[in-house]
C-alpha cells in the first residue's frame, strides 16, 4: 500500500506545487491522475520515488517511509518502485533484451552488468514478460529500430523486471498515436490485475483515463479536488478540474468525453 500524507513541494519561495496532498493507493488498482498543465501531476509521481525531493510530508510504501531514507537507503528502496517514462528512456544502441535487463542492475554485480552476463532466472523472466507484452521476437533488435509503441512496451517490461511493489507511469501515452495509446493503457490495466500491482498514471487524455482506470484522481493547483470511480467524473466535475482551460484544448485531451 502507498500512503501519502500532507505531501508538499515548493520550489524556492514560490507557491507550493503540491499542497498538503493526501492519497492512498493499494491492490490491483489502476489510478489515473488528471488535471491541466501545472496541476502538479508529474511532480506528485516524482516525489513518490524522490526523483523530486518533497519539501514536507510523508510517502510510505508497505511500511517504509521514503522521505526519511538516506541516499544509500534510497538507492536500494527505489527498486521497489517501477517507473515508466513518456520519453521511454531507452539506450538506443542496445538491444531490447539489454534494455530490459537494465531493470535488474540494482540486483546483479557490476561485473555481470558490464559483461552482460545476466543470471538465467533474469533472462527467463525477461522472455516471459516480453512474450506477455508482445515483443519477445524483438529481443535481439536494437531499441532505435522499434516503433513508439514497441519502445514503450520495452519500458514497461524493464520496470516490471524490478519486481516492483508499485508502478508509476508519467504520461506513458503522450507521444503515441491514438490506437497505440489505447493498447498501452489496456496493457497497463491488465498487468495491474494479473500481477496484483498498484499502478498510478499521470495522463492528459481523459477519455482513456475514464475507459481504462479503476479510479480517477483530479488535481488542480497542487491539490486533489476529485477522487472517485470514472463513472462519477461528470461534466460539472470536469469543469471544476479544468476551469480556465479553453474548450478546444480540453477536446484535444478528451476532457469533454
UniProtKB/Swiss-Prot annotation:
Membrane topology note: Peripheral membrane protein
InterPro entries in the record: AAA+_ATPase, ABC_transporter-like_ATP-bd, ABC_transporter-like_CS, ABC_transpr_PhnC, MetN_ABC_transporter-like, P-loop_NTPase
Domain of life per record: Bacteria
Domain ABC transporter as annotated: residue spans: 2-246
GO molecular function (one): ATP binding
Catalytic activity, reaction form: phosphonate(out) + ATP + H2O = phosphonate(in) + ADP + phosphate + H(+)
Positions with a binding annotation for ATP: 35-42
Pfam families noted in UniProt: ABC_tran
Catalytic activity, EC: 7.3.2.2
Broadest EC class assigned to this enzyme: translocase
Keyword Nucleotide-binding: yes
Record's keyword terms, sorted: ATP-binding, Cell inner membrane, Cell membrane, Membrane, Nucleotide-binding, Phosphonate transport, Plasmid, Translocase, Transport
GO cellular component, one term: plasma membrane
Subcellular localization, as worded in the UniProt entry: Cell inner membrane
UniProt xrefs under PANTHER family: AMINO ACID IMPORT ATP-BINDING PROTEIN, PHOSPHONATES IMPORT ATP-BINDING PROTEIN PHNC
Assigned protein family: Belongs to the ABC transporter superfamily. Phosphonates importer (TC 3.A.1.9.1) family.
Function: Part of the ABC transporter complex PhnCDE involved in phosphonates import. Responsible for energy coupling to the transport system.
Protein name per its UniProtKB record: Phosphonates import ATP-binding protein PhnC 1
Organism the protein comes from: Ruegeria sp. (strain TM1040)
Lineage per the UniProt record: Bacteria, Pseudomonadati, Pseudomonadota, Alphaproteobacteria, Rhodobacterales
